[in-house]
Amino acid sequence: MFKDEARKSLLQKRQNLSQTECIKWDDLLLIQFQKLDFSNIQTIGSFYPMEKHNEPNTILLTSYLQELIPDLIIAYPVIDKAFGTMHFYEATDELVLNAMGIYEPNQNKLIPSNDIDCFLVPLLGFDLLGHRLGFGKGYYDKYFSTCQNPCQRIGISYFEPIPNIQDTHEFDVPLTHCITPWNRYEFK
């Protein structure tokens, strides 16, 4: 399946989810998430879920990690549309809604890419090789290419993988893991 076709199909499928389904599936995602190894995690890059896109509730996941790792630093991305880049800043209680409808932290404390041990990665879908299907802007792939230290890249998906994304590019950075409400996937 090609990215544009898959993106359109999966976005529609996710938009058709009821609030009840999302809440139930978020709980199931948390169960799968709790089975992953976070023993070496000190800083996590996450994202604030966009309700208008029925994104999985990452707040449940990061709250679990905060209980597991009391000194955990959580960072959220700030997007610079003019340069097509993003950077992660330490998350605070005060988030600001940007022009794209994404909540971002204030930009007081930049977290260098090499300091982030694990990322929760937004996506519409993924394939059996760990290729991620996002919204098509390439922000995450560009950012991941700046990470020199090994890090976990965990996709969070309501849906099982599609067999194959046919039009991947050499600059696409694959996930290391992905969770769905029913399964965990690990990619090499």
Language model features by range: what are they?
Residues 1-97, 103-107:
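N-terminal active-site beta-alpha-beta segment that forms phosphate/nucleotide-binding
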Residues 82-188:
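Conserved phosphate- and dinucleotide-binding cores of soluble alpha/beta proteins
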